[in-house]
Amino acid sequence: MGSDLETAVGRLRLRNPTILAAGVLGLTGPSLLRVWNAGAGAVVSKSVSREPSEGYPAPTVVQTPSGLLNAMGLPNPGVEDILGELREAKKGGATVIASVFGGDGEEFAFVAREVEKAKVDAVELNLSCPHSEALSIIGHDPALVGGVVERTKEGVKIPV
């Protein structure tokens, strides 16, 4: 007999507390579903912005004497193109959290409203990516973080 690991994070209910972090496995519906079907309690999409971004040129991962160093530069297809992937993961039964980012509170709120259309369960705000000057600035200023969170929460009905 298995253990009941159901977890609640605010209004968001998870079948267990393991969550795929935002990253390269969160770019397509099939990859999100692979992680979901492997037992994750929720899956988080790759961070997405209003417009597409190519990120840094290769190599984005290099081996060092101490291990691996990764710097992707927030590549993403833009919110319009990721909606189908999010919908596919939702149709497969996954609990989906969309990771969003922008240059200011209005852009964060816009992207959050767009991903909400795909019926995602919650929104994650990428507030502190060290590879983005705007996000680095936002993440270091509590007042800016508060403004982004407030703006985003005002714009969506799902948990932020």
Residues covered by each model-derived region:
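Flavin-dependent oxidoreductase catalytic cores
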Residues: M1-V160
